[in-house]
Amino acid sequence: MGNNIKVTFDPNKLAAWWPTVGTYYTPTTTVTNPAIFKPGIYQTTSLKNPKNQQELDAILMTRYKEIDWDNWQGFPVNQRLPVSNNNPPSGQRAETFEIKSRPIIVPGIRDIPRGIVPPQTPSNRDQRRKPTPLTPPLRDTHPHLTMKNQTGHLQGFAEGLRALTTSDHHNSAYGDPFTTLSPVVPTVSTTLSPPLTIGDPVLSTEMSPSGLLGLLAGLQVVYFLWTKILTIAQSLDWWWTSLSFPGGIPECTGQNLQFQTCKHLPTSCPPTCNGFRWMYLRRFIIYLLVLLLFLTFLLVLLDWKGLLPVCPMMPATETTVNCRQCTISAQDTFTTPYCCCLKPTAGNCTCWPIPSSWALGSYLWEWALARFSWLSLLVPLLQWLGGISLTVWLLLIWMIWFWGPVLMSILPPFIPIFALFFLIWAYI
């Protein structure tokens, strides 16, 4: 007795799969009114009957390779196979197989039935024998996975296999007098794996030349900016130190007597000098001031663009509407014009618009006027300075002319920062 191999199938479409299963022994005599196979357990006595799962795989693979895929037109789904009632040929021992489905991995195909065998006339064998143990799990790797130039034909093969699947369940089955296994429930798995594309390029984990050049360029930019930052800090440190020495910066007087160092300025103390910690303390303060200056510039830029919706403390104009109509607030939207609303107990809302530009500056100015009333005296002066722009420009030119030589030794390191600020101001 061979191993039990179970399969489930649609009886109405059984013949569609039959031509690709393998060569089985089929008697020449059939019944007058041929009937289609029904799910169950049958006998077969083919010369190529598989004795185990490996032999069945070999039969399926042989049949798969015998098919002329170039001229294959699909399965004859309207074909019906007759039920055979003849006895086995002489010298051949009848083998009983319980037909069972197992997945066979084909590119684009999954969960297809392994094979079908024609029924034979039952013999008087023992009814109470124990069932044959199940076969071990089948490996998912098959030789036909390495076949080439079959992608187009396998698509038609998958379409033919889809004709075998059905969502209906048939409960009728033929019994087997030689085994105690239950009849097979006719359910077919319709799950098809996605097509496997053959010849796709393998993704390489190595960096491409363009990516390597981009990385090197990025490192160069970072190194350039870091050197400029150090140069700016050194220039500001020199300017800060020069404020304490109007006649010129002398040599460093904080040299350590234990570790003699060469003569140097206080702005370039080596680590062995006592002035080294004071030099880096000054530069740390300089870095904080530069960061504060940058954040202030960014805040002014955002306020000028109107991206900081702040409700004014003393609105120039206001309206009173029903609270149900007052639904827009500074926290709910970022599109101009803005609307600030208050909800009094009477059920009406007092609303006023937020300035489309300099909203934060207006709020800070109003806050300062509320606490320092003398600042209101500066309003006419500021308006006057704004009205005489020519005078202001002349004053600025005179200041640059007077402090020009000193500024020219300080400003060159700041030129990249000024260019960056200009680009941010122009494009934001």
Swiss-Prot record:
This is Large envelope protein. The lineage of its organism: Viruses, Riboviria, Pararnavirae, Artverviricota, Revtraviricetes. Residues 2-145 are annotated as: Pre-S1. The gene is S. It comes from the Viruses. One of its GO terms (biological process) is virion attachment to host cell. Glycans are attached at N348. Residues 2-211, 305-376, 427-428 are virion surface. Residues 2-204 are annotated as: Pre-S. Residues 2-283, 233-283, 398-403 are intravirion. It comes from Ground squirrel hepatitis virus (strain 27). A lipid is attached at G2 (N-myristoyl glycine). InterPro entries: HBV_HBSAG. Residues 146-204 are annotated as: Pre-S2. The chain crosses the membrane at residues 212-232, 284-304, 377-397, 404-426. Keywords: Acetylation, Caveolin-mediated endocytosis of virus by host, Fusion of virus membrane with host endosomal membrane, Fusion of virus membrane with host membrane, Glycoprotein, Host-virus interaction, Lipoprotein, Membrane, Myristate, Transmembrane, Transmembrane helix, Viral attachment to host cell, Viral penetration into host cytoplasm, Virion, Virus endocytosis by host, Virus entry into host cell. The large envelope protein exists in two topological conformations, one which is termed 'external' or Le-HBsAg and the other 'internal' or Li-HBsAg. In its external conformation the protein attaches the virus to cell receptors and thereby initiating infection. This interaction determines the species specificity and liver tropism. This attachment induces virion internalization predominantly through caveolin-mediated endocytosis. The large envelope protein also assures fusion between virion membrane and endosomal membrane. The middle envelope protein plays an important role in the budding of the virion. It is involved in the induction of budding in a nucleocapsid independent way. In this process the majority of envelope proteins bud to form subviral lipoprotein particles of 22 nm of diameter that do not contain a nucleocapsid. Its main location: virion. Residues 110-144 are annotated as: Disordered.
